[in-house]
Amino acid sequence: MLMGQYEHTIDAKGRVIIPAKFREELGEKFVLTKGLDNCLFVYSLEEWKNIEAKLKTLPLTKKDARAFTRFFLAGAVECEIDKQGRILIPANLREHAKIEKDVIFIGVSTRVEIWSKEVWEEYSNNTDVSFEEIAEHLDDLNI
């Protein structure tokens, strides 16, 4: 399970070190794509196959399903970790996530999220509801 929070700095070429704990779980190759809330999602190749299978079941007749699939897949790239434990985040994905220098990696069960430090701090400090309120709403889902 992917969990925890780590901070790293992106270099001038757009490369960033993937935390060692996440490298163990993700493997040498994985998929990086546009995520929700102005972050990036990282999936192991195995988990990406599960995501692809779910996307294939979305009805082509639904406008939202087509739009989501396009958004999600158009930004997807397969990444390989270099000898220094880094990946290159393409410019279009850095732009989507507003990543310029400092990044936050967050383990979220089956994926890693990569956030601009500034965007993460704003998101986590300005959430309209508290953690307790969110947990209360999820109680209805037996979580």
From Swiss-Prot:
GO BP field: negative regulation of DNA-templated transcription initiation
Domain of life: Bacteria
Pfam families: MraZ
GO cellular component, one term: cytoplasm
SpoVT-AbrB domain sequence ranges: 5-47, 76-119
Quaternary structure note: Forms oligomers.
Protein family according to the UniProt entry: Belongs to the MraZ family.
UniProt name for this protein: Transcriptional regulator MraZ
Taxonomic source organism: Thermoanaerobacter sp. (strain X514)
